[in-house]
A protein has these predicted regions:
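Disordered, acidic Ser/Thr/Pro-rich linker "stalks" and the adjacent N-terminal cap
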Residues: 436-462, 507-559, 570-577, 593-596, ...
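Trp- and acidic/polar-enriched beta-sheet ligand-binding modules for extracellular glycan
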Residues: 508, 544-550, 559-562, 569-639, ...
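Extended, low-complexity, turn-rich repeat/linker tracts enriched in Gly/Pro/Ser/Thr and Asp/Glu
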Residues: 481-483, 492-501, 570-576, 622, ...
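Hydrophobic/aromatic-rich core segments of domains that either
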Residues: 272-279, 284, 289-374
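Short beta-strands within extracellular/lumenal beta-sheet-rich domains
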Residues: 458-480, 498, 545-558, 657-660
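Long, compositionally biased intrinsically disordered regions
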Residues: 346-430, 643
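Secondary-structure boundary elements
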Residues: 66, 81-82, 110-281
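A short beta-strand element within beta-rich, extracytoplasmic domains
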Residues: 474, 478-495, 560-572, 615
């Protein structure tokens, strides 16, 4: 029995030794949730990080000669490997006091948040790639890190906004945490005290839900969003920028997302006011620096990534267009540009890095860099980095799992309205006229139409009298129930001070039978003297260039008592001296003389009876000559006329306002009332009303206008 027992013992010993000599693959450590959760609960990642490092290292051939591009490509196509690599990078890059373990241990909410982040390898990967600087110098150095404050900012968003945990809003949350307000370009008009990542997230979340951001915002990566949310402008200014531009001229937004064009509305001059807010920046004007600052701001307000650009003795703007391509605005080309994405780059390098980020190449290169950071042998590290792919070898559209649905931007015309207006209320007897209900429209402009007709952001139509217009006009047919004095108020939007419209009615002064003139521009009948007496402020009498002296004679058809006269030169302002006479028998007798005529020369004189009245132009201002008269009216009572002046306030610039009343004389019956704009910075008209002076303010509702 003793020998048999000894034999069995020897057999067991041999079997045990054999088993011990077999490979231990079934027992080898693999990345797993249990060990990760244990590290989070303990608030100590030392052991877990070491296990991750060892696991990653054993995936790489020990012999540098065996490290090939094919083998590295195979590793990078292994989702488990990439998740583990991103996790190891995430643990290693969080620093400061507390570190990742200390942060998780400090509060139960911290622990739950860290567990949520670390349970998603693709999320950690995107966070790390988003935080990675774009310039090659910083990437080679690889000393960048993430402090615990980033996690705290992100955690606040995570708990305050449950929708921030997936899709578009997750990308937005990551961007806000990584690039807090004020960490982008800092320039004129920026906030004195910066907002918080939580408030900035709420600002853009609300704007997106209200359909205030451009359609292409939905297609942005987290990295692209960092160049939106990092704006140094206040949240109040960002909201103002959207409302002001959507009100004043929404075509900038919804036609090709060209919001940077608004910066061109800044007058190129030293500002006349301090840059307290972005509205002050826009109104006060500025040279290249302030214009660049505003250009970056207004892009970011609408969700368009933008960066300030330095050029020789100049500043410009780089922005991402709706097709995903970066462009330069307000400056010269890329080859003279310098800009920064955490590190300084030339314009050419920036474009290369953007191109790289659009492909898997950026992620693959950084993954190999992270992997090399876990190795110790110099030859092994060099062999790994030698396999980095070229951009041309990379596949397009590197979309991670939490970026679903990135596609072409929706057509701007399908954009829903943000703020449908309440029903308009009109008092009995009040004449209410919508801007789009015009009978005549026109203008003389250096660029584009004198008056732009566009869709109002709140429904219906609006008119925009543009900055490049020398003069513009619009006529509205109205029916006046009773002759008398009416108060004209208008709903307008302006972004600069000093903006106004000239209003004019006809009918109180005499209808002129005919007119003759000393000269007509190129004998063009459409510019003949009759055009100055037709009660149409879109027509004019013009003389030939090179002439400063001439005359126009009016025939009233019969002798009439006259004591008042209006002469309108619009914006031409070419006359410096003139004389007005009336015919008494065969003689001309003077009524009055003057210098400038301008928009409205309104004269009252002792009554005389006359059938013929003559305006003589005696001298001009410019070398080219060629006076132009848009209207001449005479009578014994004035027509309604005057200026509608818009107020400017930094807090409400660009938003709708109702002007102070302008008293206008109207004559009962059908007529046309005219609104004209001089050369100025731009004004938008929504509607106007004419109320009999002294009438009741009782109102009734009008059906809402149709939405777009």
């Amino acid at each position: 029995m003793k020998q048999v027992k000894t034999g069995k013992s020897l057999l067991c010993l041999v079997c045990s030794m054999t088993l011990l000599s077999l490979p231990m693959t079934v027992c080898a450590w693999e990345p797993n949730a249990k060990d990760r959760d244990a590290a989070i609960n303990a608030g100590n990642f030392t052991a877990y990080s070491g296990q991750l490092t060892a696991w990653l290292k054993q995936k790489v051939p020990a012999d540098p000669a065996q490290i090939t591009q094919g083998k590295m490509r195979a590793l990078l196509s292994d989702a488990v490997f990439v998740d583990a690599l991103a996790e190891r990078q995430f643990i290693g890059k969080v620093w400061d006091q507390p570190d990742l373990g200390g942060y998780a241990k400090a509060d139960p909410k911290n622990k739950a948040f860290v567990a949520w982040v670390m349970s998603n390898g693709k999320l950690m990967d995107e966070v790390m790639l988003t935080r990675t600087p774009s310039d090659m110098s910083s990437r080679y150095d690889n000393s960048w890190s993430i402090n615990a404050g980033v996690l705290e900012n992100w955690k606040q968003i995570y708990y305050a906004y449950p929708e921030s945990r997936e899709g578009l809003y997750l990308r937005l949350a990551v961007a806000c945490a990584l690039r807090p307000p004020g960490t982008g370009n800092v320039g004129a008009g920026m906030a004195k005290e910066q907002s918080t990542p939580l408030a900035r997230f709420g600002n853009y979340l609300k704007a997106h839900k209200n359909k205030e951001l451009v359609p292409s915002f939905d297609t942005l990566t987290a990295w692209e969003m960092t160049h939106v949310v990092s704006s140094g402008a206040s949240d109040k200014d960002l909201a103002w920028g959207r409302e002001a531009l959507n009100t004043w001229n929404p075509d900038y937004v919804w036609k090709d997302e060209n919001v940077v064009g608004l910066a061109s509305q800044m007058k190129y001059q030293g500002s006349q006011i301090p840059y307290y807010t972005m509205s002050c920046l826009l109104a006060g004007g500025g040279k290249c620096g302030p214009r660049s600052s505003f250009g970056v701001f207004i892009n970011q307000a609408f969700g368009i990534p933008a960066i300030g650009v330095a050029q020789p003795a100049h500043a410009a703007v780089a922005f991402r267009d709706k097709n995903g391509n970066w462009q330069i605005a307000l400056g010269r080309s890329w080859n003279v540009s310098k800009l920064s994405d955490r590190g300084n780059m030339s314009g050419g390098e920036f474009l290369e890095r953007v191109k790289e980020r659009k492909t898997k190449a950026f992620g693959n290169v950084e993954h190999l860099r992270w992997l090399a950071g876990n190795l110790t042998g110099k030859a092994q590290i060099a062999a790994v980095m030698a396999t980095t792919p070229a951009i041309a070898d990379a596949s397009k559209d590197a979309i991670v799992a939490f970026q679903p649905g990135r596609g072409a931007a929706a057509a701007a015309s399908t954009k829903p309205l943000t703020k449908p207006e309440p029903p308009i209320k009109v008092a009995p007897g009040v004449i209410h006229v919508n801007a789009g209900d015009f009978a005549h429209i026109g203008g003389i402009s250096g660029v584009g139409p004198g008056v732009g007709v566009g869709d109002c952001y709140t429904g219906g139509k609006q008119l925009h009298f543009g900055a490049m217009s020398q003069t513009a006009w619009v006529g509205y047919k109205i029916n006046v129930p009773k002759t008398g004095i009416y108060e004209l108020t208008a709903r307008v939007s302006v972004i600069n001070w000093g903006q106004r419209l000239y209003a004019r009615s006809f009918g109180a002064m005499y209808r002129v039978k005919s007119a003759t003139a000393s000269d007509v521009y190129r004998q063009d009948s459409s510019l003949g003297p009759q055009m100055a007496i037709d009660h149409d402020l879109g027509t004019r009498w013009a003389m030939n260039l090179g002439k400063e002296q001439g005359w126009i004679e009016l025939d009233l058809g019969q002798p009439r008592s006259i004591s008042k006269m209006i002469i309108d030169e619009h914006s031409w302002d070419r006359v410096s001296r003139f004389r007005v006479e009336y015919k008494a028998g065969n003689d001309w007798k003077m009524l009055f003389e003057g210098g400038d005529i301008g928009w409205e020369c309104k004269k009252e004189f002792p009554p005389v009876t006359a059938q013929n009245v003559r305006l003589s132009l005696l001298d001009g201002k410019g070398p080219s000559g060629g006076p132009t008269i848009w209207d001449i009216s005479v009578g014994d009572v004035f027509d309604g006329s005057g200026w509608i002046n818009a107020d400017w306030d930094p807090a409400t610039a660009g938003c709708w306002q109702t002007t102070k009343p302008l008293e206008m004389r109207l004559v009962a019956g059908a007529q046309t009332i005219w609104l004209c704009a001089p050369s100025q910075r731009g004004l938008t008209l929504r509607w106007f009303e004419l109320k009999p002076k002294g009438t009741s303010t009782q109102v009734y509702a009008v059906a809402p206008r149709k939405t777009l």
